[in-house]
Amino acid sequence: MIRFLAKGLIRDRSRSLFPLLAIIITVTLVIFGIGFMEGAMNNLLQSTAVISSGHVKVVTKAYKKESNQLPNDLALFDTKNIIHTLSHMYPDYFWTPRVTFGGLLDVPDINGETKEQAPVFALGIDFFSERSRQTEIWELEKYLIKGHIPKSRDDALISTKLAKQLSVSVGSSVTLIGSTMDNAFTTYNFNIAGTFDLNKGQADRQMMLVDISGARQALDMTGAASEILGYHNSLYYNDEEA
């Protein structure tokens, strides 16, 4: 029976070739489409994980309810011990504290008076720990336009859009005007170590990145963090595991 069908297909190529080509093309397109969608989805999830959520996130219940207001008075305390516990409970993930805050960036003139001012969305991330992978996660070596990665707690990276708005460049000094985790008024000086462009449109328009030690110093948050983010060791998001 099989031999009979094979002979029929060979003798009448018009009935065998075109259906075979149609099947091959269809299967190829389906495989390509699935691969493309999985890649695009993982890229989207990775972008979201970097900027806001991690693959998993630990916050206080109170902070979660008011997270859009960046309520650092509801932050996590004793984060070092929390991260130690999480690392033992979930060894497939690595954990990093983050301080998320907003305020105004003030640029003084030669007389110390305000020359330029703009709102800022700032993230205090762990640049300096021995096992930190933040530079890798943010791909800063790829997106850094000018300057260098922060080397001290007073160094800051700002987006090229924000640098243009404030008319500042690498080496300039800016003053953060904001509030501490106890809602007290605070000012803190940062030195612009570099500028970056994440190519994420409005998401990084007013963004500033500093080391978490500088953020804690500026906001009086010793040992505290707005949130603790967890990333899978492979940096690939797995919804079932999360």
Predicted segments, located by residue:
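N-terminal Sec/SRP start-transfer signal
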Residues: 1-31, 35
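A short beta-strand structural signal in non-transmembrane regions
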Residues: 56, 162-163, 224-242
